[in-house]
Amino acid sequence: MNFFQYKHNKLYAEDMPVQQLAEQFGTPLYVYSRATLERHWHAFDSAFGNRPHLICFAVKSCSNIGVLNIMAKLGSGFDIVSQGELERVLAAGGDASKVVFSGVAKSREEIMRALEVRIRCFNVESVSELKHINQIAGEMGKIAPISLRVNPDVDAHTHPYISTGLKENKFGVSVNEAREVYKLASTLPNIKITGMDCHIGSQLTELQPFLDATDRLIVLMEQLKEDGITLKHLDLGGGLGVTYTDETPPHPSDYANALLEKLKNYPELEIILEPGRAISANAGILVAKVQYLKSNESRNFAITDTGMNDMIRPALYEAYMNIVEIDRTLEREKAIYDVVGPVCETSDFLGKQRELSIAEGDYIAQCSAGAYGASMSSNYNSRARTAEVLVDGDQSYLIRRRETLQELWALESTI
């Protein structure tokens, strides 16, 4: 459930009229709901009851420090993939001891900084990385806590660009090689093995791929026991899907119950999850103004002031996201539109063949935009990044101001 609802045919974010936000802050505009973020995080956290667990919000999904601060206040951990994300977490008041560091290309500087602030663990993705971390930790006089990211070769049945658990993907160590890598890790003087990690993909709408991956990890854990290697945690990553249109992904409680049943023989093993989209997607919308309506022999176009520079998911993943009118009290003729943006690319669209009742100057909202929206935005076509607003009840807070045009070239120089 989210807190974007119609009241008297006008769209509200919690107790704030979205039209008022658009008029106050301008468009394009990302709007987030605090109550929705908190509800979704608690859905994961409460699902595990008294079982040792840690919910690590995936920073990549929605990296604004205003959002991260809400997560930190809830006691959330964080899944990061860069030093930039680490610094965001720290700036937002996050606890470094609840940070897990994923990613296939961790640099020397990133590893040093993570060791300096004492993150919870590195999710190691290759033998080379493991040796690199061991060397750097030794130079710093530290012991690096590590979890090996195991690639279980499980088909997540999702878009190929967000499938991460097949043997042809770049992520992690093959499940068939992981035992030997753990043995190697156990011999390195500056490494402490703390757990096992796995992430098979994103926007999964069924439980079976998760359970198949868990089965393979359990087999590996038993093998490690034979080798005298014990684990303190099992990190099953993120990936639980959300409802964009008519998808019916499992509820976090169903997911948790299935995992707890699988892991009932490991009561002391802490479970770590890394949800991102499942927390933030339906906690945000992207508000735009209809600049022009245009028709040709085959199509009607609603041309808006936002596009793939602000929301690239439709272009990159062929993602379907609902588009709705902000004010349904207005008398408008219904028509089928391709909703497009101002960017000079044919792939610049928010949605195709959508029935809308709109006129030029009206506001519309792209739903489920809280994940992989602002965090994947760009300045393509020299367009300034949009503002972001957080709604808390009947109050709104500007958590990112709109970029100025001068800031587009502030880091550049002529010769």
Swiss-Prot record:
Keywords: Amino-acid biosynthesis, Decarboxylase, Lyase, Lysine biosynthesis, Pyridoxal phosphate
InterPro entries: Ala_racemase/Decarboxylase_C (IPR009006), DAP_deCOOHase_LysA (IPR002986), De-COase2_C (IPR022643), De-COase2_CS (IPR022657), De-COase2_N (IPR022644), De-COase2_pyr-phos_BS (IPR022653), Orn/DAP/Arg_de-COase (IPR000183), PLP-binding_barrel (IPR029066)
Entry keyword annotation includes Membrane: no
GO biological-process terms attached to the record: lysine biosynthetic process via diaminopimelate
EC code(s) of this entry: 4.1.1.20
SUPFAM superfamilies named among the record's database cross-references: Alanine racemase C-terminal domain-like, PLP-binding barrel
Pathway assigned to this chain's UniProt record: Amino-acid biosynthesis; L-lysine biosynthesis via DAP pathway; L-lysine from DL-2,6-diaminopimelate: step 1/1
Keyword Signal (UniProt): no
Pfam families cross-referenced by the UniProt entry: Orn_Arg_deC_N, Orn_DAP_Arg_deC
Subunit structure: Homodimer.
Family named by the database record: Belongs to the Orn/Lys/Arg decarboxylase class-II family. LysA subfamily.
Name under which the protein is recorded: Diaminopimelate decarboxylase
Organism from which the protein derives: Haemophilus influenzae (strain ATCC 51907 / DSM 11121 / KW20 / Rd)
